[in-house]
């Protein structure tokens, strides 16, 4: 039956029953497994490849497996290189999670730029918000641990700063006096400058890992040069159906497999990152599995903001023939999605079907676009945010503790690199603060869950890129 002749039946493009593993919580496993039949044999990346196990590259995505994560890991191992250790043997219990970098208590995550417990997080936040200035009676040499962390506030705050906690990351609008308060308390800025000149800090910097990583502008330049945004936006699965009356099935098949193409592009991008060789392959696998949906939305959002001009917040009228995505009106974007989806499929897709299946995703993506456009992110800030997003570990990560430490250290490095960039003077100086960007990241995370639930991974790209203007290197 012609899709245009009926609004009661669900168009094939919205029928996801043919995805054998679509019911799994993490759809990435399906796509990674399917990639095994389409990718070339493992690339020789370095000396570790001499130990490469023989992985099958013909596994069917419909075959049952006792461990879908293991199957997915095999595919990523074949793309990224050889794991240095068995990821299973490196798994640790939740009870052995990372410790607070300030007092050694159990860490609850990354707070203001450092992995800390709730106690040190709250102490740091209150100190900055209340503009406290502490003094030590013991020459600033008090030991700070779980038992005596409350004995000397001065040394505790000093250690917070030395471990990378950022006063700039504390919300300005929660400061006494609201947003009119100073974003960086001058006393803290002065004290931080003094601390960084101390012998202890210099020795700590000399001992820090990842000495091979470039720093500052050089690191950002490498990230900009290696970014795969053009390839990620110009997805082959979004080609226009050449005939207006041809079978809709092949186009639907391309769209349902577009996750393959997305993951492959993200894997290739990961291999170009300056810190690729600093982490074992199982860490890259774990990070991509957790964060690929966020990277999709971030990339599509930045592309839209760099190509289109955000519309007025007062825009409420439906624009029937618009060729631009709206940053404020989900209804405009639903109509845009309907037009472009019909163009790709060669069949008219009823608007009510698009609204029913993609409405929540389009609404959330529009909201995300609006908030992201307000940040006015530069290309340099975008690539830093992208690296920070990839390196964000969940609290229940099962990676080996030593790997978790490395990932957190790397993320800290990119947070500080972003901070330095945001404070660069000049004509192109950023008006956005680090705190504003950190506040936006949870919105990105929440939107990614809607994308995963919808299974329509092509929607952000189809909204941001007119399929008539796709460019391929062939």
From Swiss-Prot:
Compartmental location: Nucleus
Key words, A-Z: DNA-binding, Metal-binding, Nucleus, Receptor, Transcription, Transcription regulation, Zinc, Zinc-finger
GO cellular component, one term: nucleus
ZnF bounds (NR C4-type): 100-120, 136-155
Gene3D superfamilies linked: Erythroid Transcription Factor GATA-1, subunit A, Retinoid X Receptor
Alphabetical GO biological process terms: cell differentiation; nervous system development; regulation of transcription by RNA polymerase II
Protein origin, superkingdom: Eukaryota
Gene Ontology molecular function: nuclear receptor activity; RNA polymerase II cis-regulatory region sequence-specific DNA binding; zinc ion binding
Protein name, as recorded: Nuclear hormone receptor family member nhr-91
């Amino acid at each position: 039956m012609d899709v245009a002749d009926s609004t009661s039946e669900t168009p094939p493009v919205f029928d996801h029953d043919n995805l054998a593993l679509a019911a799994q919580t993490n759809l990435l496993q399906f796509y990674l497994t399917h990639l095994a039949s389409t990718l070339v044999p493992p690339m020789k990346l370095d000396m570790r490849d001499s130990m490469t196990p023989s992985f099958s590259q013909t596994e069917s995505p419909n075959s049952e497996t006792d461990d879908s994560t293991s199957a997915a890991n095999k595919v990523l191992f074949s793309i990224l290189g050889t794991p240095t250790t068995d990821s299973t043997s490196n798994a640790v219990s939740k009870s052995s999670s990372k410790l607070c970098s300030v007092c050694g208590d159990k860490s609850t995550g990354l707070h203001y730029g450092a992995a800390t417990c709730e106690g040190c997080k709250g102490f740091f936040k209150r100190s900055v918000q209340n503009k406290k200035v502490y003094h030590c009676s013991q020459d600033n040499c008090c030991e700070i641990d779980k038992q005596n962390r409350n004995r000397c506030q001065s040394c505790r705050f000093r250690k917070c700063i030395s471990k990378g906690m950022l006063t700039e990351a504390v919300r300005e609008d929660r400061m006494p006096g609201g947003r009119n308060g100073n974003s960086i308390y001058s006393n803290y800025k002065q004290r931080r400058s003094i601390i960084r000149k101390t012998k202890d800090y210099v020795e700590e910097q000399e001992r820090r890992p990842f000495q091979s990583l470039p720093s500052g502008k050089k690191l950002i330049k490498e990230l900009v040069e290696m970014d795969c945004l053009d390839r990620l936006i110009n997805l082959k699965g979004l080609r226009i159906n050449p005939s207006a009356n041809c079978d809709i099935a092949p186009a639907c098949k391309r769209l349902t497999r577009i996750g393959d193409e997305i993951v492959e592009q993200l894997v290739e991008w990961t291999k170009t990152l300056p810190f690729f060789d600093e982490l074992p392959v199982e860490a890259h696998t774990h990070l991509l599995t957790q964060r690929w949906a966020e990277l999709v939305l971030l990339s599509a959002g930045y592309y839209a903001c760099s190509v289109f001009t955000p519309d007025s917040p007062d825009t409420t009228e439906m624009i029937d023939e618009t060729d631009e995505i709206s940053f404020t009106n989900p209804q405009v974007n639903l109509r845009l999605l309907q037009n472009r989806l019909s163009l790709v499929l060669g069949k008219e897709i009823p608007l009510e079907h698009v609204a029913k299946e993609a409405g929540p995703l389009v609404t959330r993506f529009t909201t995300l676009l609006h908030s992201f456009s307000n940040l006015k992110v530069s290309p340099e800030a975008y690539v830093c945010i992208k690296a920070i997003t990839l390196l964000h570990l969940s609290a229940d990560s099962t990676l080996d503790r030593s790997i978790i430490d490395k990932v957190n250290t790397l993320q800290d490095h990119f947070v500080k690199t972003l901070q330095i960039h945001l404070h660069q003077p000049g004509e192109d100086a950023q008006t956005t603060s680090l705190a504003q960007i950190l506040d936006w990241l949870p919105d990105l995370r929440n939107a990614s869950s809607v994308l995963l639930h919808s299974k329509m991974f092509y929607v952000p790209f189809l909204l941001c890129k007119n399929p008539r203007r796709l460019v391929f290197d062939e």
